[in-house]
Structure formats: structure tokens, C-alpha cells
Amino acid sequence: SRTEGFEEYRKIVEGYTPESVEAITGVSAQEIRQAARMYAGAKTASILWGMGVTQFYQGVETVRSLTSLAMLTGNLGKAHVGVNPVRGQNNVQGACDMGALPDTYPGYQYVKFPENREKFAKAWGVESLPEHTGYRISELPHRAAHGEVRAAYIMGEDPLQTDAELSAVRKGFEDLELVIVQDIFMTKTAAAADVILPSTSWGEHEGVYTAADRGFQRFFKAVEPKWDLKTDWQIISEIATRMGYPMHYNNTQEIWDELRHLCPDFYGASYEKMGELGYIQWPCRDESEADQGTSYLFKEKFDTPNGLAQFFTCDWVAPIDKLTDEYPMVLSTVREVGHYSCRSMTGNCAALAALADEPGYAQINTADAERLGIEDEALVWVNSRKGRIITRAQVSDRPNKGAVYMTYQWWIGACNELVTENLSPITKTPEYKYCAVNVEPIADQRAAEQYVIDEYNKLKARLRESAMG
């Protein structure tokens, strides 16, 4: 056997029969059994998940339980199987690979191990590196309020749009002594910055992306940037040099080669080899032609001290935010085709803005709309324990009864004003997928339309003023 802990796992799972979880999941016992048999009976099967799994209080536990399900059915450690997060953007995996996590250096080498701190301190030419791990972005409001974080340097991110409980995030930014934003467009966060550093877009520089399957692939500059703009790595290098820590890289290959020499799993993925193969999945530990990467993990053993995979599950915990008579509906924040992520890029595209613009939409079920007296396309108020926003109703049978779906990119209808700061105790990820709300019709639609126009114009004017300094 390549696993351990099955007996403990079975004891917990036995308490959750298909019939007993119908009310929790909204899925019938028959359908649960049918899905289980389809998965268990497949020759090869892969589980893919998105933010609907991870953005819950028990997100980590759910992912580990999915992994145990794959272990139970033999769907780990061989070709064409596995458990796979569908990452939110094309280089989320790459950012993690490079150490953009609070507890690891590049290559998932943990800060807590002295040998890793010593290795990176020597390579980076400093006497020592801190023993403690960093903080997660969702912790910023509380850390800033207590003086534990005094400055923020933000690249390609808009936390004043995308983070939960935006009123608390704004207060956190007010508590900071210095905010630097490095981006390609003005955002709400850039408008709150003390320093704005314009950078190049994806078509104006080169580098390496990592896909969700651990695949490195080079990308190349398509056009020269205008106005003598600098790339992200050039900006960071110049700032570091002026602050007394010289960085004299000449190109991205020098940076990549430094990284390879510090990360054994990446060492064999040279620019030359990527150029020949087009794509290399790490681990790739040898520069020779023979090592062309690793198509799947755990062929021989698992990444545990004894090489055995460990079964895991736990008892279910209900979402933290509770439904009441005042807040009887469940808001889930989602993404939709049309605008990308927080809309900092696609919001500047006139064609896309013409298709869908402020204040965005709240999707609600037809029966709920009839009960509340809400017509399709009418402006409504959506209220939670943390905030209140105006948006436009989109009435259909797509959402379940009692459910509200909202995309998080709208500036006026910013649904993250509503989301409570209930964080996973492990990852500190907010529970974006479960927020108790109510939807309130607006009697004077003409006044509401004018209110949206006025608020939108004020926001755009503030962004222009911030951009002009």
C-alpha cells in the first residue's frame, strides 16, 4: 500500500451517508451515488476545482478531502489522473513557484528551515534572513491597525476592489505610512497610493509563465513599450540599487538562471531547453537533453517523510455567516465572461464596456424577484451585515432560489463591500462564496439611475486626478 490513515478516514466518512448530506449539498442521494460510481469506475479520472471550493471557511479541508477521494480510487501517481486546481489567472502557479507566498522561498523551500534561510541569505549576499514567515494580504487591515505592517508595495493587484469587507481594507490602507502601486492602469488601489509606478503590459516584456500543470513556457515581447517605460524587474532592480542593495541584472535570463541554481526542481529548465521543447513541467533537475521534465507527480513515492500518502477528512462545519429573517439570501461572488477579474484592463476597453457597464448585476431567481417585486434590469439595493451597494437585477432561473450571484469587478456595484471577513484559519482566504444578504427594490428608478451616473462620474474623476498627481 502507498497510503496510511485509512481506518481513521473511514470512521468519519461513515457518518456522512448520501441521504444525510442531501440537505447540506442540495444534491439527491441518488445523484451522489451515481457520481461516485462514475468516478470510481473510470479507468482514469481527474478532479478539477476552482474558487467555489477554496473560497470557503473549510476550503483547505475540502481540497484535502478531494485528494483523499483520488487516493481511494487510485487516481494519483499515474498518467491522466490527479487533483488539479483551476488557477484564477495564467501565472498564479508561476507566482507561487517564485516564492510569492508568506512562508516559502522560490521553489517551495520553507522559511522555517534554517538550512533554507542560510542558503538564500548566502546567495543574496546578506548576513541573515528573518525566521518568521510573512503575512497574507487578507491580514493587512488588522496588521496595519496594530503597526505590524507599515507599508505596502502592490504590483498588478487591486485589493481595494477584490478583497473582502472593503470598508476594513480601506481603513487598513489609511493606517499605512506608505503605499506604492506598480501597474499598467489606474485602479481604486492606485488612487489611494502615495507613489504610482507605471509598468509594461504582458505584450511589452518577456519572461516565463508557469501553467497550472507545472509547465514552464517562455513568452516574448511583441511591441516596444512607449514613453521609455520600464519592466517590473527593471523597476525593482533600480529601487533596490538606490536603497543600497545593488541589483545589476542585464536581462531576464540572468534572473532565471539565478533562480534555477537556487531551486533544484527547476534547475534543468534552462532558457535554451525551453526554447527547444517549448514547454517543460517541473521537476526538471538536470540540464541534459535526457531530462525533459515530469509529466505527473508521485510515481514512486509521495512528498511525505515516509513516502506514503495520508488520508484526510474532517467533520463538516457550516459557513460562518448565518441566514436570518433580515438577511435570508446567500450571495456568492463569481466571475463571468465579458470582463476579466477586477476589470482594471478590460474596463478600459470601450467595446466591452458597451456590452456591460456600471453598476453591474445581481443575478437572482425568478421566484425571488416576483416575491420581492423586482423587475429584470431594475436597479436594486443589496445589503449585508457589512455594507450596502446599488446594482442592477438580472432575473432568470439560472440561480437557485435564495441565491444571489454577483461578479466582483464593478466599481459602483462592488459586491466585496458586502462580503464578511470570515477567514480560513489555515490560508486566511475569505469566505467569498457564502454571505448573508437581502435584496431591496427601489421605487424611484429615475433617481436611482441618476445616482449611479453621478457616482460613476465622481469615481472616474478621482482616478483621473490621482493619475495626474
Segments predicted by a language model, with ranges:
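Long, well-ordered, tryptophan-enriched scaffold segments
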Residues: S1-A42
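A glycine-rich, hydrophobic/aromatic-adjacent loop/helix-cap motif
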Residues: Y39-H142, D213, R285-D291, E300-L308
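Long, contiguous, secondary-structure-rich segments that constitute the structural scaffold
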Residues: K226-D228, D232-I280, G347-Q363, A367-G469
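Flexible glycine/proline-rich, aromatic-decorated loop/lid segments
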Residues: I184-F220, W410
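Long, low-complexity segments enriched in small/aliphatic residues
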Residues: V86, Q93-P102, K119, E254-A351
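Conserved short loop/turn motifs at secondary-structure junctions
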Residues: I24-V27, G50-Y57, Q89, G156-Q161, ...
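Short, well-ordered beta-strand core segments
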Residues: A45, A152, V179, A193-P198
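Phosphate/diphosphate-binding loops
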Residues: A168, D175-L178, Q182-T187, K221-T241, ...
